[in-house]
Design a protein with these regions (language model features):
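N-terminal pro-sequences and low-complexity stem/linker regions of secreted or lumenal proteins
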Residues: 1-202
Length: 202
């Protein structure tokens, strides 16, 4: 584990390890309510730009995702999932385990940034966080850790490994400065519309 400055130094030198996990300072750089989304977006942009501008861009894959949905509404019910093992969740007496570990949570944003990412591609496959493990296991020929990652999809449909779509890094729009008043205000002036009862099925 190294401070984030070490990531930026290694990205600039092309000396990042084969796999690394980048986490923001959740107390300051989270995009989750009630924090300033612009600060989190600025951090993500710095990470993406460090990889694009680095000498190892041609062999880079960044998976940008989130640990959970942040409490925001999702009209799609979580689907069933393969439990990772046969061990039930430990819950206090009298509390329900609901579906145990046999159901996914709500959807989270997920993007692949790489010269090998398919241009304009939106995957319609079900992925979960163990899909990242599955991709790592596939790349380095490693055994699965649980039943869930053994049965996960490795996200290869998002990549074109025959030819890079972004051999020359794309020009990205710069995020609004966190001091820009328009970056600090919400564009919604009132509550959103709630779907009528029975209109959302799953």
């Amino acid at each position: 584990m190294v401070p984030i400055a070490g990531f930026f130094t290694d990205a600039a030198a092309g000396t990042l390890p084969g796999y690394c996990l980048v986490e923001p300072d959740y107390g300051a750089q989270s995009e989750e309510n009630p924090q300033n989304i612009a600060v989190g977006e600025e951090f993500a942009a710095k990470v993406v730009n460090a990889l694009i501008d680095g000498p190892a861009w041609d062999r880079t894959l960044l998976i940008l995702t989130y640990d959970e949905h942040g409490g925001y509404y999702d009209h799609v019910p979580p689907p069933r999932a393969i439990p990772p093992d046969s061990i039930p969740p430990a819950v206090p007496a009298g509390e329900s385990a609901y579906d145990g570990f046999g159901r996914y949570g709500f959807r989270v944003p997920f993007a692949v940034v790489s010269p090998w990412a398919r241009r304009h591609h939106v995957s319609h496959r079900v992925y979960d966080h163990t899909s990242i493990l599955k991709l790592v296991e596939t790349k380095w020929n490693l055994p699965a850790l649980t039943f869930r990652d053994a049965n996960a999809t490795a996200m290869l449909d998002m990549l074109d490994l025959r030819r890079p779509s972004f051999a020359s890094p794309p020009e990205l729009a710069q995020p609004l400065a966190v001091t820009d008043p328009s970056a600090l205000s919400c564009s919604v002036t009132g509550p959103g519309t709630i779907p009528p009862p029975g209109s959302v099925t799953g």
